[in-house]
Amino acid sequence: MAFVLSLLMALVLVSYGPGGSLGCYLSQRLMLDARENLRLLDRMNRLSPHSCLQDRKDFGLPQEMVEGDQLQEAQAFCVLYEMLQQSFNLFHTERSSAAWNTTLLEQLCTGLQQQLEDLDTCRGPVMGEKDSELGKMDPIVTVKKYFQGIHDYLQEKGYSDCAWETVRVEMMRALTSSTTLQKRLTKTGGDLNSP
């Protein structure tokens, strides 16, 4: 597990870069919060990974969309924002409170909320008047379906400890992928297909 955490931390550290390419300032704090959120998710581990193998599931993380080169700036920004919002919604529930260490869960929710607030400063400049249109675009719908699948899985499994552990691991994967998108947003201006 220490190797996995080290690998995740290395991925996040590589994603540090100067902000400001979006016509607004994506603060360094956004990346620091991302790293801290991954660390908190790792610390929330309560069960041996081997004890929940029967509950593993492929939730269909739209990884090629998050890590690939197919999104323009506004789309990428919206996907990142939606992933963080849905992650916050997932962990900011009564059922989630019953499953996790309250202190760690509150810290995670605070970190996710901080990332959302940092991104809110860029919503206007990036999205402009297109806000309502972008909410209906395919990448956002894909992210919403992905998270709906996670909610459905938890309900189907009765919000069991193993179900939550499976979701915790999946959220580490999703948030790690979202750091790739954050990195691209801080390094490019306008067209995410640029080198």
UniProtKB/Swiss-Prot annotation:
MF (Gene Ontology): cytokine activity; cytokine receptor binding; hormone activity
Biological process terms in GO annotation: defense response to virus; female pregnancy
Annotated Pfam families: Interferon
SUPFAM superfamilies the record matches: 4-helical cytokines (SSF47266)
Membrane-crossing segments per the record: none
Location(s), subcellular: Secreted
Tissue expression summary: Constitutively and exclusively expressed in the mononuclear cells of the extraembryonic trophectoderm.
Keywords per UniProt: Antiviral defense, Cytokine, Disulfide bond, Glycoprotein, Hormone, Pregnancy, Secreted, Signal
One GO CC term on file: extracellular space
UniProt main location, coarse: secreted
Disulfide bonds: 24-122, 52-162
Note from the entry: IFN-tau genes are intronless. They evolved from IFN-omega genes in the ruminantia suborder and have continued to duplicate independently in different lineages of the ruminantia. They code for proteins very similar in sequence but with different biological potency and pattern of expression.
Family listed: Belongs to the alpha/beta interferon family. IFN-alphaII subfamily.
Cross-referenced PANTHER family: INTERFERON OMEGA-1, TYPE I INTERFERON
Name of the molecule in the record: Interferon tau-10
Natural source organism: Ovis aries (Sheep)
